[in-house]
């Protein structure tokens, strides 16, 4: 009896960088989601909230582009933030079809806490890094983000 063994070639990744970045992002976001639950912020909403606090008057399209998410995701998150009293939505003065998003006093109050926590996460991520290593990693990730941003805009259309 002859048994044939087929060789199965599995394609491998050229780099694990996206898996590492994804794991890092999910871990930090999971920690933050747990910590912000008491603030009545649901999964990932703190990301939208911080960008609105940092860019008062931003519209949904600009916010979606900034965060690299689709407009439906942004709309859903913003509706929840409005309902929770974190964001005000006002009709754009120049384009009556558009709306501008502004932080409320409530969101400005928690913004400081969110930034403190984000800085703490950054400190943990950079534990045992030299200042030069921190700068190099940051510059390289910014460069990678820019490369992906161009592709994201192409695919988004």
Language model: regions and residue ranges:
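Short, locally clustered residues in the helix-turn-helix/winged-helix DNA-binding domain
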Residues: 22, 50-54, 115, 142
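C-terminal regulatory/oligomerization modules of transcriptional regulators
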Residues: 1-10, 131-157
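N-terminal helix-turn-helix DNA-binding core of bacterial DNA-binding proteins
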Residues: 26, 30-73, 84
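N-terminal leader segment of winged-helix/HTH proteins
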Residues: 1-39
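Alpha-solenoid HEAT/Armadillo repeat architecture
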Residues: 10, 37, 53, 68, ...
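A structural signal for well-ordered alpha-helices, especially hydrophobic packing surfaces
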Residues: 25, 111, 145-148
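Charged, amphipathic alpha-helical coiled-coil/dimerization segments
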Residues: 29, 79-139
